[in-house]
Amino acid sequence: MPLSSPKQRETPVSVSKSSAQHDATPSPSSLTPLSAHTTPGEEVSTLKQGATRDEKEATDGGRVEGDCSWFQEQTCGLILECVADMDACFKAFDKDEDGFLNQSEFSALCRALFRNERGKPYPVETSMLNTIFTIFDTNKDHVIDKEEFRYCWQKWIKQVVRPVTALVIVDVQNDFISGSLALINCPAGHHGEEVIPPVNRILEENRFDVVVYSLDWHPENHVSFIDNVHMRSLHSSCKLMCEETQVYDTVIFDVNNDGTPMEQKLWPRHCVQNTWGAELHEDLKVAEDAILVYKGTDPDTDSYSVFWDNNKKFHTTLNEELQKRGVTDVFVCGVAYDVCVAATTKHAIEEGYRTILIDDGCRGVSEEDIAATREHTIANQGLVVHSSQVKNLATGRDRPPALAYKLALEL
């Protein structure tokens, strides 16, 4: 994957308005060295596209569509080899040769499927296996016939063993590293720059189908800035007066002056459009095949997630871009762990993606909220992993049950 480091040049990257969520025309000098061309009217800027599937397969051991000779597992003392196609796989697990997969046979397939990169099987709860079987037994006759298995193969097994991956790098910008909202000054005392080495390493060692960089991109009068608190009416239910507010306080605005309350956490002024603080950090590698998402551009609405604003009224086109590329798995890293990374991870799960949170590629504001982010991710069939685990997950060599279960539940 070609990479570059952000440097200045005279011709900026620009993205034009596409929705109320993205109503600015950003031109961050930090992104200018990319061999990029933006399309007017797009809120998400797509840079040079990444490797083709053929190129990816060439770097992945020569695996090609329909060839599952790599899928060799041992279960119950029997070496099971799928050497050609879907029919060969079905036949390998149809032990009684009756033309169906009963629950026991299908469970054996799942146990063969759910293995780590060393071939060691994961423990799988019987209830999970039963649920997955029920999902694919669409006519509820307690066996999976060949037509049902075709659906299972196309929509589930192929995705489990050959995921289509996106890496979403959230807000690795100067203001969060060493600027006005540097994480070192937040309660957890984290060093935001510590995310850069693992993120760069992930980019260098892996070939994702798409890489996404998000940027907080606020106008001067943004609702989240504490020095702007006087610019909007506080709701009658708000217990704080303007002059009493402090950084990290949560106030309730009556933004539209119609009595509708809107909660807002107050932050120092940060990531103002076209300023140094809004640029990606100079040491962060930038992939040529990247999508850039600018968020928080509406003066009256904050936007932590790379998918949605905080009120979930306006969405970016990120989900559309991922869907166009057939993405199944979203890997998330960046800052702040418990704020924008947390919101992005939550929404990725809600949008139906198999979601992997890269723990050492994140730094955050509050240790308590970081722990809550991890717990929420795991409780919703996501994974929290170390960056060293990413390659095997992204290539389908490591196939944890939680991710396969999440995919089945979305069908």
Predicted regions and their residues:
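Glycine-rich anion-binding loop/nest that anchors nucleotide
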Residues: G326-A343, L357-C362
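Short, surface-exposed loop/turn motifs that are enriched in glycine and acidic residues
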Residues: R269-N274, F307-N311, G334
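Intrinsic disorder/low-complexity segments enriched in small, polar and charged residues
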Residues: S18-D23
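Active-site acidic carboxylates
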Residues: P2-K7, V13, H37, E43-E97, ...
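Short Gly/Thr/Asp-enriched flexible loops that form oxyanion-binding sites at enzyme active sites
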Residues: V341-E351
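Alpha-helical scaffold elements lining the catalytic groove of polysaccharide deacetylases
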Residues: D300-D329
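Short, contiguous clusters of charged residues that form electrostatic/catalytic patches at enzyme active sites
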Residues: Y151, P197, K313-E320, A343
